[in-house]
Amino acid sequence: VLSMPFGTKLPFDHSLVLEGVGNAANAGVAFSRLGLKAGLVSNVGEDDWGRDIIRALKKQKVDTRFVHINNDKVSNYHYVLWYKEERTILIKHEEYDYHWPRFRQNDVPKWVYFSSISKNALPYHDQVADWLEDNPEVKLAFQPGTFQMEAGVERLKDIYRRTEIVFLNREESVMVTGGSYEDLHDLF
């Protein structure tokens, strides 16, 4: 349990600001560093933070042509609180108007890594699922975020159906499969 009195100042060890992070951005950077062609479909706000994110991704050789800058919006900013081996992430997704891009034929990726987006983006999942249906050669890796887990397997069944690789921790695996936490094999 995280508990702190309001109205006080709390000391901390240090802080570190990282631009262009999150599940999908991290994956894009990792793939680029491995020498693979990587791009990011994402949204940022029309602010310094959004420009810093795009600049950081370009520096890592991640294609940012499909990063949409949302006018009059701010960029997502999350806080990670670390204590020993444990962490808590304070999240807030901005309410962007999500649209899956129209790729030119030579820009269609071999793989899509789909991850956490905001609560209001459920219709966006349908756009992604429809696009995947129209592009059966494209493989999908899926790491559901907080709001996708809340939406449930039934609502996202078209995404799960097309998923080649899913990334879940044990608790999430129980939620998705209905299996037993104690029986790891039951979760596959």
Where are the regions a protein language model picked out?
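Glycine-rich phosphate/adenosyl-contacting loop at the front of the ribokinase-like
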Residues: 1-41, 51-52, 59
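Short, well-ordered strand-loop elements centered on a beta-strand within folded domains, enriched
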Residues: 11, 15, 48, 85-91
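A generic secondary-structure micro-motif detector
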Residues: 16-18, 42-43, 118, 146
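Charged, low-complexity surface patches
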Residues: 20, 46, 121
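Beta-strand->loop->alpha-helix junctions that form or flank phosphate-binding loops
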Residues: 41-46, 65-74, 188
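Ribokinase/PfkB-type carbohydrate-kinase core domain
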Residues: 55-69, 81-188
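Glycine-rich phosphate-binding loop of ATP-grasp-fold ATP-dependent ligases
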Residues: 76-78
